Amino acid sequence: MLEKEIEKKFKKALEAKGCLVYKFASPNCRGVPDRIVITDTGKVLFVELKTEKGVLSKLQRTQLKKLRDFRQQAFVLYGLPEVEEFVNNIDDWR
């Protein structure tokens, strides 16, 4: 499955659970996670989506570390099974 298709399913499933899901595009700061998820309780989660065989770039690893250093919840999900698990467990982050 293509990353674009994974992103579409991710967004649709989380919106069905009452979350806001935004595409994170920062032209001046490359390597940021694909999506920002905001739960109905105000929790903010950063998510990088990859195919099952996807690989993080060095820049993506650096950006994820920066977010985590600032005590932000940042995730990397590989493929549809991990997306489904994340969505099924979103209540843990509310």
For the regions a language model picked out, list residue spans one by one.
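Catalytic phosphate/metal-binding cores of nucleic-acid and nucleotide-processing enzymes, i.e., regions
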Residues: M1-R94
